[in-house]
Regions:
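Conserved PLP-enzyme active-site core in the AAT-like
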Residues: 2-222
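Feature for intrinsically disordered/low-complexity regulatory segments and propeptides
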Residues: 221-229
Length: 230
């Protein structure tokens, strides 16, 4: 109930000790940077692609991620933002597999992707692609109250007891029961009505795009915007 900021803090500090190294995308959320400062953890950055026409950050290149991993084999983990704040996704599965082959834990800030599992028309979720720890802002794209988020863990690489212990240290000892209840309600809506609601939303988005075509001064940026090499 301290937002995804709390989840990010717990995820990073559960796998990294002071002076350890972690690989992160440079366009990460401020909570990542703040956690590295608080935990005295060294970052190795992967810089994102930038669309030259819109200046929109378009996510990282797989080649850059692999190259950064190879140059920082002493890193304990890699943290990636997926999807980006602009909705851009990339081949996370390849990065997860490669990071795992080098003994690294994969943390994903999926703050804007809690809805991805609701339709086959949407990109694969971070968990489906092999991430070990995924932090989601349930309040952003699912119907829980603002500040309520979730941390998901899968596999045997993560020390769940350590993560839980750190959560207890940094999370409020007086959590709002309204926020916690809203998370339970969001899960119920997700499971019982989520797919139908998402289908309706995707149809409405298509209608909106078609309606915008008549406005010459408005351009809709597509997910596959071409990025010119400098």
């Amino acid at each position: 109930v301290n937002g995804s900021t709390c989840g990010i803090q717990a995820a990073i500090m559960s796998v990294c000790n002071p002076k350890d190294k972690i690989i992160v995308n440079r366009d990460c959320h401020q909570s990542v940077i703040n956690t590295l400062i608080l935990g005295d953890i060294e970052p190795a950055y992967i810089y994102p692609q930038i669309d030259n026409k819109t200046n929109i950050l378009m996510g990282i290149k797989i080649e850059d991620a692999i190259d950064t991993i190879d140059k920082n084999l002493d890193a304990k983990a890699i943290l990636l933002t997926y999807p980006t704040y602009y909705g851009k996704v990339y081949d996370l599965k390849t990065i997860c597999n490669y990071a795992h082959s080098k003994g690294m834990i994969v943390i994903v800030d999926e703050a804007h992707g809690a809805h991805l599992g609701l339709s086959d028309k949407l990109p694969m979720t971070a968990l489906e692609q092999g991430a070990d720890i995924v932090v989601q802002s349930t309040h952003k794209t699912l119907p829980s109250f603002t500040q309520s988020s979730m941390v998901h863990i899968q596999g045997e690489r993560v020390n769940q007891e350590r993560l839980t212990s750190i959560l207890r240290m940094i999370e409020s000892s007086s959590p709002s029961y309204m926020l916690m209840s809203s998370l339970e309600l969001a899960v119920d809506i997700y499971e019982t009505k989520g797919k139908d609601l998402m289908d309706e939303l995707l149809d409405n988005i298509d209608i909106f795009k078609k309606n915008m075509e008549k406005y010459k001064n408005i351009n809709i940026v597509q997910a596959d915007v071409h990025i010119e090499e400098e």
